[in-house]
């Protein structure tokens, strides 16, 4: 069974690679869940190089590249918050899905949460993204709330909020 290697982004070139991959992944995965116009808008607002650079510099985000061999196949975006770790982004290209890489990526996120002594990890996921919701539930996340967020340009993010409690003694 193949495995992945996860590497923290250290510079602008790393973030640029992630942003290019993000646009590809979003256009592979989200049609049928949200409109193409909303995909384009959300990529520009939240997944572009400029957005990621701002998140790293001003919002305590850190990004991690996911490799299968030498190929960049995914990325993770984490945000340090006062009381928990926010799993903002966990994405894989279509060719890397179904190989249990998401579970390896989640284990990596758990280690990051433990490193910062967080009691929990939370995330938001589109209510109509049934596959990802099922994966997160399998990982042990629990639904704690729902939220509709106006993100501008007449678009709404219609999400479930999920939480994973770390076993801490």
Regions found by a protein language model. Give the residues of each.
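Basic/polar N-terminal segments that are highly enriched at the extreme N-terminus
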Residues: 1-3
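Acetyl-CoA-dependent GNAT
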Residues: 6-15, 19-95, 106-108, 112, ...
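Glycine-rich phosphate-binding loop
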Residues: 96-100, 152
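Substrate-recognition "cap/lid" segment bordering the active-site pocket of phosphatases
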Residues: 98, 107, 134
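Short coil/turn segments at alpha/beta junctions that flank glycine-rich nucleotide-binding fingerprints
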Residues: 99, 116-119
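Residues forming the Rossmann-fold NAD(P)(H) cofactor-binding site
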Residues: 103
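C-terminal "cap" of GNAT-fold acetyltransferases
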Residues: 119-122, 126-133, 137-139, 146-169
